[in-house]
């Protein structure tokens, strides 16, 4: 028991120090004074201007929930920025919140204004680069053990890792690191969604199911191999989630790859810890496995 306490003592001390850096002020005057004193650079004007345009576009396009209910989102966001106790979390997370807002709004963009869906580009590039259709080859042999091995990083760690990485950076990395991570994480995914809107491309499951027949925006998504996980655990979570996904034709760029890369880079930079496994040296870049 004493050994456990000895191990937890430095962790609890680090958490206590990190929590001590947080503000508990609820004074709106404090944030308003900071805003008035802030000197806006050209980069700030461009960044927040572009974010405002994208947020305005998203709120305008969204039809469910309708007016006035959808205005609750910007109202709550504005109120959260006014109080120091909440703005210290909301402001750095703004790129992430904007990415999620735009991602949700994609389902409401009129198909008549959207570009052509590219069905054969990615399979062709895959064949050129790898000499074969890797997606097709990987689906020829299946086993529940392989499904679980693929599901853990793709369907579980992918959604949990950002919070774990942010918590570790908050406790052990220099002050302000989490803000940089949140901005990088959010803008990376935000740019990814913008590319997906401008260059919609079909995912591997589409070729396996539909071939290279032309796609349209009325088609619904598919859980692909994750449907076997639903069947294995007698659930419907992945089937419902991916079938109703706002972005169906967003195979490029892969947001799974984006988040895994972002997490691996931050972790390997701030925690350059290596472990020897046989002849191999493994460090925190193994998070890229989440892709």
Locate the predicted segments by residue.
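Structural signal for the C-terminal ends of transmembrane alpha-helices
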Residues: 62, 79-87, 168-175, 267-272
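N-terminal transmembrane-helix/juxtamembrane module of multi-pass inner/ER membrane proteins
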Residues: 2-73, 83-163
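Divalent metal-coordination and catalytic microenvironments
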Residues: 106, 158, 181, 200, ...
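Membrane-interfacial catalytic/cofactor-binding modules of polytopic membrane enzymes
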Residues: 197-271
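Interfacial segments of alpha-helical transmembrane regions
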Residues: 93, 162-199, 205-215, 278
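Membrane-water interface signatures at transmembrane helix termini and the short loops
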Residues: 255, 262-270, 274-291
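Membrane-water interface at transmembrane helix exits
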Residues: 103, 107, 111, 170, ...
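Aromatic-anchored segments of alpha-helical transmembrane domains
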Residues: 53-60, 81, 101-105, 189-194, ...
């Amino acid at each position: 028991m004493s050994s456990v306490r000895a191990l937890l003592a430095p962790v609890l001390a680090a958490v206590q120090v990190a929590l001590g850096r947080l503000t508990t002020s609820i004074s709106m005057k404090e944030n308003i004074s900071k805003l008035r004193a802030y000197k806006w650079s050209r980069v700030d004007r461009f960044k927040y201007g572009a974010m405002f345009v994208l947020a305005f576009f998203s709120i305008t396009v969204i039809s469910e929930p309708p007016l006035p209910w959808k205005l609750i989102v910007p109202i709550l966001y504005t109120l959260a920025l006014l109080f120091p106790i909440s703005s210290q979390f909301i402001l750095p997370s703004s790129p992430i919140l904007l990415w999620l807002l735009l991602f949700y709004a994609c389902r409401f963009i009129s198909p008549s204004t959207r570009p052509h869906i590219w069905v054969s580009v990615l399979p062709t590039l895959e064949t050129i680069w790898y000499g074969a259709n890797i997606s097709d080859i990987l689906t020829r042999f299946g086993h529940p053990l392989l499904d679980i091995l693929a599901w853990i990083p793709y369907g579980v760690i992918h959604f949990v890792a950002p919070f774990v990485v942010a918590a570790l950076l908050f406790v052990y990395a220099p002050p302000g690191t989490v803000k940089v991570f949140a901005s990088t994480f959010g803008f990376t995914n935000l740019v990814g969604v913008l590319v997906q809107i401008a260059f919609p491309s079909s995912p591997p499951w589409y070729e396996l199911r539909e071939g290279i027949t032309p796609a349209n925006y009325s088609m619904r998504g598919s859980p692909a191999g994750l449907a076997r996980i639903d069947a294995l655990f007698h659930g419907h979570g992945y089937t419902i989630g991916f079938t109703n996904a706002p972005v169906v034709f967003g195979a490029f760029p892969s947001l799974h790859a984006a988040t895994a890369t972002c997490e691996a880079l931050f972790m390997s930079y701030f925690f350059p810890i290596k472990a020897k496994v046989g002849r191999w040296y493994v460090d925190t870049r193994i998070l890229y496995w989440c892709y």
